[in-house]
Regions:
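Acidic (Asp/Glu-rich) catalytic motifs at the cytosolic membrane interface
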Residues: 116-153
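Topogenic membrane-insertion module of multi-pass membrane proteins
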Residues: 1-114
Length: 153
């Protein structure tokens, strides 16, 4: 993040509705990981949870960038494109839970990491399209897309 944007994010007050929406998405993501952890084990939950926590940290840090440009006002909500980007990041976190694990038993679990990554790849293409179509492209969305790309590699 550039120094100008960093200064901008420190000075911008965040709307309570935007904070609540982000908190709800973070909690839903964590709940989904806990359910997955019950099925896949504690190591999977720890690894996926660590990546999801990092994604939530990066998102919270960048919430003041939920605007089309630095001189524009903040959007009141995340918008569908940013929600899709966060869903994509959640899929990537779920895939990361399978790293350093024994090969999953059974055909369904063996294919699960690949299917999760496929969903993430499809959402990578869709989120930008949704942002442009809905007229809610944002600096936040661009940054989250880059963070998700980096983690997904």
């Amino acid at each position: 993040m550039s120094d100008t944007l960093r200064a901008e994010t420190q000075q911008t007050p965040i709307d309570g509705l935007l904070k609540r929406e982000f908190f709800l998405i973070g909690c839903l993501g964590l709940a989904g990981l806990v359910v997955g952890g019950l099925l896949l084990g504690l190591q999977w939950l720890a690894q996926a949870g660590l990546i999801w926590a990092f994604i939530c940290y990066q998102t919270k840090r960048r919430l003041p960038l939920n605007r089309p440009s630095t001189d524009a006002p903040l959007y009141k909500n995340l918008g569908w494109a940013n929600r899709l980007t966060l869903l994509r990041a959640w899929f990537i976190a779920a895939v990361a839970g399978f790293l350093f694990q024994a090969w999953p038993e059974g055909p369904a679990l063996s294919w699960l990491p690949g299917m999760l990554y496929l969903f993430a790849a499809v959402l990578d293409r869709v989120d930008g399209f949704v942002a442009r179509r809905s007229g809610q492209s944002s600096i936040l969305g661009n940054d989250l897309d880059t963070v998700s790309d980096a983690i997904g590699l």
